[in-house]
């Protein structure tokens, strides 16, 4: 997409709560900057089982930022609510549960169309994963079976939130996150961004900047992973091999 025509405005957050801080505290300034003068936010709570409690928590937190939040699970016409909202917030939790709901409620296309038209998108954890082409880099248990692994395709790369570096002193013999990402790359072409805790990707059209105290770890098929900070815009220029599916 030509950057002059690219209206995407995304904030992709590794984790909604940082150790020692409250819900979305570390992301508040970035959220405020992203939404600007907009006031109404539509919330997608389907990554958690208790949608009422999740919505109440998000409503209270965003109200403290001067924002009015409503949830898609409280309205009769979800697509209409997405169409009318000033911003979209997809919360974290179980990615399989979230993706199943996105497909079953027909939310993939309405969300994608609005975001590509310039409506701000906030995604935390699972909500960040689904901004990519598929859910294939989630670490979550497959507690439900979605009809497809395809997600929103707002960015052409995969996201692996809560990225943990291998601990050389650990006696645990299970797979590391890096090993699992390498398994993904054995079968898939899309680049993967490992987002450490406290990290956020801020997409403004054709520009993407890493925010937060930690570098991201970038994985590409056939290449050694590397650390990256600051401007990560080149990742937006890559082509995904899997598009979104309604």
Model-based region annotation:
Residues 16, 93-96, 127, 164:
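Short glycine-rich anion-binding loops that position phosphate/pyrophosphate groups of nucleotides
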Residues 95-96, 128-131, 200-202:
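Short, active-site-adjacent cap segments at secondary-structure transitions
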Residues 40-43, 47-98, 103:
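Portal/gating segments that form or line small-molecule/metal binding sites
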Residues 30, 104-118:
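Catalytic-core regions built around general acid/base machinery
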Residues 83-84, 117, 154:
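Alpha-helix C-terminal capping/helix-to-coil transition sites in glycosyltransferase folds
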Residues 2-37, 49-56, 136-137, 141-246:
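C-terminal and late-domain segments of enzyme folds
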Residues 89-92, 115-134:
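Catalytic nucleophile loop
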């Amino acid at each position: 997409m030509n950057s002059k025509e690219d209206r995407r405005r995304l904030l992709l957050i590794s984790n909604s709560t940082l150790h020692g801080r409250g819900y979305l505290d570390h992301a508040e300034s970035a959220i405020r900057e992203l939404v600007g003068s907009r006031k109404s936010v539509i919330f997608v709570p389907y990554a958690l089982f208790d949608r009422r409690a999740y919505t109440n928590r998000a409503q209270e937190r965003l109200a403290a930022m001067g924002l009015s939040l409503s949830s898609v699970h409280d309205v009769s016409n979800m697509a209409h609510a997405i169409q009318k909202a000033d911003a979209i917030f997809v919360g974290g939790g179980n990615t399989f549960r979230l993706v199943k709901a996105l497909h079953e409620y027909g939310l993939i296309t309405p969300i994608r169309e609005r975001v590509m038209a310039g409506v701000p998108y906030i995604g935390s954890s699972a909500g960040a994963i689904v901004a990519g082409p598929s859910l294939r880099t989630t670490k979550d248990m497959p507690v439900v079976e979605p009809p497809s692994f395809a997600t929103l395709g707002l960015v052409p790369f995969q996201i692996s939130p809560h990225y943990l570096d291998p601990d050389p002193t650990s006696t645990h013999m299970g797979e590391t996150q890096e090993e699992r990402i390498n398994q993904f790359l054995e079968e898939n072409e899309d680049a993967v961004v490992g987002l450490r805790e406290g990290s956020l990707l801020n997409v403004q059209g054709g520009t993407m900047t890493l925010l937060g105290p930690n570098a991201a770890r970038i994985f590409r098929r056939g290449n050694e992973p590397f650390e990256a900070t600051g401007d990560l815009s080149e990742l937006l220029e890559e082509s995904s091999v899997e598009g979104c599916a309604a």
